[in-house]
Amino acid sequence: VSVLFAFVILVKKQLPFTLTKADFRINPQCRKFLGIGLPLALQEFLTQMSFLALCAFVNRLGLTASSGYGVASKIVNFAMLIPSALMQSMASFVAQNVGAGNQKRARKSMLTGIGVGLVFGCAVFVLVLLKGDVLVGIFSPDPEVVQKGFEYLKGFAPETIVTAILFSMVGYFNGNDQTLWVMTQGLIQTILVRLPMAYFMSIQPNASLTKIGLSAPVSTTVGIVLNILFYIYWSRKTRTSQ
């Protein structure tokens, strides 16, 4: 709908330039745009599919556990708003500075983003860990659902801290056109760490949502290590090419 409205405005509004049918065609820039955007789109698609798989693992534990996980997921989505916003703004800011030839400021922005994210992440961590049951209780009055939701949040809580680091690094690499690497490290986290760990924890006797929730911060920590190693490699490669 927004695209249609934009097109109507372009047609009706007096612009300082003209648009013709010939302007809408494939050009050499399209390949570059696809090279940047497709890896991110694929990663996002597979990440969402992994959440469906995680939901299936939890559903094996029964209706109460599934309901608790569903309620906890709402709180998780809210907790991830600030890291996600930092990642998106980081990518734009870094890209502008890289385009201006100011790589030093781009690196500083990544460190600043990590610092800001950690402040909010630690605050959310304490809130979720100490008052997670109160937060879950906002969405469900059932004490068993509240208990199960709180169990998951206790395992997930460290994710609010480590995500602040990972998302700022991901935003930095996105701004430097390293989207293929961003996709690669995301798939490694999801396919090789998060899903196997969550599945393994879900099939244990007396499976705990806390241990299943831990799969998120563990996989994110692996992602941080991978990104640090790639940052060192990429920085050396960039200096050598210059």
At which residue positions do the language-model features occur?
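Small-residue-rich hydrophobic transmembrane alpha-helices
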Residues: 68-132, 163-185
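Transmembrane alpha-helix boundary and packing residues in multipass membrane permease domains
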Residues: 40, 44, 52, 56, ...
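Hydrophobic alpha-helical transmembrane segments of integral membrane proteins
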Residues: 35-36, 79-80, 91, 192-193, ...
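Helix-terminus/linker motif at the lipid-water interface of multi-pass membrane proteins
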Residues: 45-78, 96-97, 134-143, 202-204
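Interfacial/gating helices of multi-pass transporter permease domains
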Residues: 29-36, 40, 57-77, 143-150, ...
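Short runs within selected transmembrane alpha-helices of multi-pass transporters and secretion channels
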Residues: 1-6, 84-87, 156-175, 181-193, ...
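Short alpha-helical transmembrane segments in multi-pass integral membrane proteins
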Residues: 1-38, 94-159, 202-242
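Hydrophobic faces of transmembrane alpha-helices in multi-pass small-molecule transporters and flippases
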Residues: 2-5, 25-53, 57, 78, ...
